[in-house]
């Protein structure tokens, strides 16, 4: 299918001013750049994509927009039109090329299915954008897929500075997927190399020559050899797979044009593509997870204020309450957590955590808090900290509220949660399955550190649930009314130990018999999601790691001194975390990498 000829003026907004020239300035003007925007069914990511383009630190008078959209079944066209109407006058030139019909390709099985006709049409569009940039006299053209979010506002300047003919900013994703290949076979297929992971993980930093970049990359239109580059038609000798990214890689190779990827900076994010049989909802869920990852790892994504977005409809997912324990003096954590819940459309309620730094012996005596005789941290040998007392009291207050209000089931989050992909959908499905099996339960871990996962048995009829063994952390769990009653009935305040040590005692899985002897009955029915649905945002040793329980005063020390116990095994990134789909946990390349 050939790209359609230029549309009538009513369909094509072509605001072509003369190429900006320097006028009375001491320094030469910045190079001119065309931003090529090709959007299809991008409603879920366009607001953040366009917001990132708006924030690029680059004069609008030196930028042109080339925008095309086609074959949409969502609101992509209206979003782009709204955005161009709001910001288009700020740019040196704007090309607007929408196609309302058809809404799909004849042979496609769904909107994420790549047919030969779709590949060809995309190549023709990219070629049209490239031709426009050359005719307009631009110095560069930036291709950036609409689910690639350039959170670094210096991206254009940083890519232009080294003077490379074709260069990509290395983008991060939810997995090890990125926008470059380190190896390619003689037949044009992906080849694994020893360089990929050190590059992707930034164990080696710089700008490196690679055989292919895709999704987001900058092409210098002044560099030697780039005048021969083309997306369509393919090179006369081309025999590799019919795919736009491979066609362009071959064109670079044939023209002798070096291709580089740069990873010294964090430039932004790209969404892991869904499989061909999946739909737009799967892609939307993936992108929400990418937003959440950016909130943790930074910098965050910001949506354009010039685009109307579908309204959010937060819910409690069928629970009576969704509690978020958060210290008032950690507003950044609270804001991140509430933003994460909002993005997932989860309605949460903040519970101000008890601040261990505000506790003293007098307050704890008034509350009836006393140390469990003989308690020591299992790894550092230290005693209970005031931070751990505050943490326990925070959870305890929620258990009390559950019983007082008669809440049938609740979710409890701490404010350092990293959510796994499709957290909301997977939790809702898990609870539906638990209800269908009529499983009696008191507590279900959603995130924890397993000590002996090989000893945990899958619950019959519930493949995503295991009987919980000895575990650390209380960052995310589901609690029933019956479970809250059991926890309170054990009167734990007068024989306190960390809350994540207390819970395994209550379901009789703690290895310390002396500790267990202080509590009876130990009949809490505890389970865990498998794979886990949440993990900590950071671990001991990470640059952003911070703990108000590990960096604290001993429980009976009123001097105010803070001691950091950072070597506890509990806070380290352990190999026994049962995670799936999270950042850095999947080593399998995406199918498109195996072309």
Swiss-Prot record:
Main location: endoplasmic reticulum
SUPFAM superfamilies: Nucleotide-diphospho-sugar transferases
GO MF term (any one): identical protein binding
Subcellular location: Endoplasmic reticulum lumen
Transmembrane segments: none
Top-level lineage group: Eukaryota
Motif (Prevents secretion from ER): 592-595
Keywords: Cell adhesion, Endoplasmic reticulum, Glycoprotein, Signal
Similarity comment: Belongs to the glycosyltransferase 25 family.
Protein name per the record: Probable inactive glycosyltransferase 25 family member 3
